[in-house]
Structures are given as structure tokens and as C-alpha cells.
From Swiss-Prot:
Name under which the protein is recorded: Defensin-like protein 2
A single GO BP: defense response to fungus
Residue(s) at site: Interaction with trypsin: K11
Pfam families xref list: Gamma-thionin (PF00304)
Function: Inhibits protein translation in cell-free systems. May inhibit trypsin.
Amino acid sequence: KVCRQRSAGFKGPCVSDKNCAQVCLQEGWGGGNCDGPFRRCKCIRQC
């Protein structure tokens, strides 16, 4: 199963999946990407 959660530390609009993924990795997640109509940074990991 894959768990997704909005990044706690990402600031501003999410325009780069790479930047989002780096923030998520620092938060202990497996990665992340920009998602949804408001382009929020969502972190992902196996759970």
C-alpha cells in the first residue's frame, strides 16, 4: 500500500517534482510530487 500526505515543510506553490521529492526525503518519506489542482507537494512512501 502507498501512503500519501501533504508535506509539512514545503513552502509556496509546488512547481517542481524534484524539489518536492527532496523536501519529502528530508522529512523521512520515500519521495514526493506536485499533485492536485492547487499543486500541493504530496509525500509518498510504502506503508
